[in-house]
Amino acid sequence: MGGRLNDLIQVAYGGKNVILSMMKNKTRQTSSVFINNLNSLNNNNNNISLKDKFKDLKDLKDNLNEKKINNDNDDDDEDNLIFDEKKDFLNENKNPELNYIKSKGHKIPSSQTSRFWEFTKLAVGVGAGFLGEKTKRTIDSSSSSSSPSSSYSAIFTDTNAERMAESFSRMRGAALKIGQVLSIQDESFLPPKFVEILDRVRKNANPIPLEQLYNTMSNELGENWRSKFQLFQDDPIAAASIGQVHRAITLDGKEVAVKVQYPGVADSITSDIKNLSSLLKMIVPETAYIEKSLESARSELLLETDYLNEASNQLKFKSLLESSINSGTNGSFKYLKDLYVPNVIMELTTKRILTTEFVHGTSIDKITIENHNQETRDWISKNILSLCLAELFEFNFMQVDPNWTNFVVDFENKRINLLDFGACRNYKSEFLFNYLKSIEGGVNRDINQILEYSLKLGYLTGDENKQMNDAQAKSILILSEPFSKLYYKENNLKTYPFNEKQIAKRISQLIPTMLKNRLKPPPEETYSLHRKLSGCYLVCSKLKSNINSTLIFNHFKNIFYKNYK
């Protein structure tokens, strides 16, 4: 199992260094030299010429900041259009629970040229910052700048976090997605200050100007789009990686959420992924198998830009959840009854606009140990863990985006609203059977069973050395701890204290061994699965939950075996 770094790689939308092949003009050739020099430095630790390289890159950065790509005046002129205070609804009585975005609208760069330019500036800035940090550490005799961890920490500095946050927020799309993924890592994976800075990316992405908003609404719903609503709030209540969300009231009086896709995002996914790879190659070793994850990530993100597909996923998920709750035969009612999926308003939904029932509540990123008691936090964690296991072993269909804002707690009605079904996938029964067997091996502390089913799943080839086999077995043992009665008994536990056990940190300690000894990439299905499971564990850890996870696991395990054919 690839651990936390592999989880990042799998969702970071990296790949081959295609930036180099795209570079044709002088600026791009210079950037190519920059990337090659940076990779050479990172791989060979050629500290003799470090100061000279840093000076060259500083000059390049200054030069790039003075240049401007003219692209028919389409995107590079960042006109800052301020949202009007029009006669939109709720201007006089806005919901205080919601954070309306009244900042300047930033025009999103939508052409390939303008987005390439943004990535080039970011790469140069991050690279110059990296070399500056390496130079400082080389001069400091107390620092061992030749170590891999030194290169890693030289990338993840506060200054580079600020660069990424600003750039990702401006570009949205795949770029902003990586910022959001980085922002929900725990402190065992990234420096706390780095996570804190990038958390702004997740919470405060820039909205688009009204001009772009109105153009999209007109293109998708017609020039008379406002006539399809009683009221429409121009100020978005959320701005994320692919689109932003507005409140509205339909003609029949329903309060709805209207998600509007950013212009050009769908067309930029592939090139964005290729451009991001140039940044990842500074820190990611070859054995991380970026190439394998690239196509999966690209396909997943492209599906997220199709809101008709998301509407279909949401309706399917709603049907599966309600059928399970209402069946009354398998006992899932008590595990899933407090979960809710909003309705979809299909007549106001297109490929670029998604309209759904508006739900109220507090996203789980705002739930803290200071403002909610243990019982409430445990209730939330039980629901999130039950949902994750139901998706795998009962529905065989999973929403794989663990963004904390996708879970909204409605305390008044005591339910958790589930949002954002753009990233979903089905799992075949054969894969789930082998995966469950490997987890059961961990639950029963059976190393042979873990390795047997790791081989069947495709984690191993059978030719791995003892170090790799041991690391694989340990990762499964750690992952399965919350579900193991034997582990509870051995450690005198009645419930599993997620925060104390630090699952992510312990698995991350196995990463160097795996990256050094791995012979093949992890199975493709686990990229998204482990992103979701990791997110689930992080929620339980953040809330300092103490729950009997064995009961939940055994329930959904039994459902799977009952239905398995």
From Swiss-Prot:
Q: Which residues bind ATP?
A: I237, A238, A239, A240, S241, I242, G243, Q244, V245, K259
Keyword Cell division included in the entry's annotation: no
EC number of the protein: 2.7.11.-
Q: Which PROSITE patterns match?
A: PROTEIN_KINASE_DOM (PS50011)
Which GO molecular function entries does the Swiss-Prot or TrEMBL record give?
ATP binding; protein serine/threonine kinase activity
What keywords does the record list, in alphabetical order? ATP-binding, Coiled coil, Kinase, Nucleotide-binding, Serine/threonine-protein kinase, Transferase
EC class of the enzyme, as a word: transferase
Coiled coil start-end? 44-77
Q: Give the source's domain of life in one word.
A: Eukaryota
**For the Protein kinase domain, which residue ranges apply?**
231-565
GO biological process annotation, one example: ubiquinone biosynthetic process
Output the PANTHER family linked to this UniProt entry: COENZYME Q8, PTHR43851
What family does the entry list?
Answer: Belongs to the protein kinase superfamily. ADCK protein kinase family.
Q: Indicate what this protein is called per its UniProt record.
A: Probable serine/threonine-protein kinase abkA
Q: Which organism is it from?
A: Dictyostelium discoideum
Species classification:
Eukaryota, Amoebozoa, Evosea, Eumycetozoa, Dictyostelia
